[in-house]
């Protein structure tokens, strides 16, 4: 697979249980007092698999084999552990080395990030951190079935976003919609076919481009401004944007400060960004995105004719701050 791999199953169930070499494994405060060497705990080292940079825990209900756990209420709970390990490590290395979402000295150099697989039918997956120490994410099997593991790529993006804050590298505005937009952009970096996989996001965005940049309805649908910024400023720029974000600012204010842009200059840049978006004119994914280029519907349906022969944009489609019509 190209990375270190370790599984509790390979170590046996002896009294001399040995943890894998390499980075340490953090035990969160909420599990203080639990014996993770014992198989009776909710999470256990005996139900853990590791890559060089991540520790994957599964709840007790899975038993000893993620490939053949007992069904839950008639639903299969199997997870392809080898694919999960491969993709997690691939995502991790890209986010660390290419996007540079963590800097040297990060606590992630000491500890493995943590993936907690829950024995549940809930469709939940979310990323964050444990105790402002190490990034983590939590997921149920129904979010771990696609081979590309898009949900995992997104949630691990959140793990890195929060890792940066845990490392004391800024406050990222105290939190806002760009966390979701940023995680989608990170997913798109490791899966350039993201729009093919989740075309419903693109279809929905085309109907809502008039809404404000960072409008909550669009934050999962529109990583395109971040793609434009990263193409202009380099891949590591987005991670630095998160580190530079201050309470009292929003991401636009932070970007303008970092680039020393006036409001007029920023407006011009946003217009250029949307010109690129219409044709999906991004070098990284240009050939892949041809099916989606210039695919906006006829805008005349969004206009109303006035008595003097002019047309006016309908009220519902008037652009909000940094929104656009096409």
Regions found by a protein language model. Give the residues of each.
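Extended hydrophobic/Leu-rich segments
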Residues: 3-6, 31, 43-66, 72, ...
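Juxtacatalytic substrate-recognition/specificity segment
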Residues: 50-175, 179-183, 193-196
């Amino acid at each position: 697979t190209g990375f270190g791999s370790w599984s509790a199953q390979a170590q046996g169930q002896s009294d001399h249980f040995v943890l894998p070499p390499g980075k340490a494994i953090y035990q969160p405060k909420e599990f203080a007092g639990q014996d993770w060497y014992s198989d009776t705990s909710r999470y256990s080292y005996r139900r853990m698999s590791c890559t060089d940079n991540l520790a994957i825990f599964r709840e007790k209900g899975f038993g000893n084999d993620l490939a053949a756990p007992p069904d839950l209420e008639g639903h299969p709970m199997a997870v392809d552990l080898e694919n999960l390990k491969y993709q997690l490590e691939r995502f991790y290395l890209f986010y660390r080395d290419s996007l540079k979402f963590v800097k040297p000295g990060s606590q992630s150099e000491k500890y493995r990030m943590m993936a907690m697989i829950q024995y549940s039918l809930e469709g939940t997956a979310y990323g964050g951190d444990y105790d402002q120490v190490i990034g983590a994410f939590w997921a149920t099997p129904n979010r771990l079935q696609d081979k590309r593991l898009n949900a995992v790529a997104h949630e691990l993006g959140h793990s890195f976003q929060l890792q940066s804050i845990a490392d004391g590298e800024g406050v990222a505005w105290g939190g806002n919609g760009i966390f979701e937009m940023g995680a989608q952009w990170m997913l798109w970096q490791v899966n350039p076919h993201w729009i093919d996989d989740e075309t419903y996001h693109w279809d929905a965005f085309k109907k809502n481009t008039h809404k404000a940049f960072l409008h909550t309805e669009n934050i999962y649908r529109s990583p395109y401004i971040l793609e434009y910024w990263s193409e202009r400023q380099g891949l590591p720029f987005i991670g630095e944007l998160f580190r530079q974000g201050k309470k009292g600012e929003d991401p636009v204010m932070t970007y303008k400060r970092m680039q020393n842009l006036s409001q007029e200059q920023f407006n011009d840049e946003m217009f250029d960004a949307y010109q690129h978006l219409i044709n999906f004119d991004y070098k990284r994914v240009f050939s892949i995105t041809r099916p989606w280029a210039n695919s906006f519907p006829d805008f005349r349906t969004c206009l109303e004719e006035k008595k003097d022969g002019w047309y006016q944009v309908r009220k519902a489609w008037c652009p909000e701050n940094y929104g656009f019509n096409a």
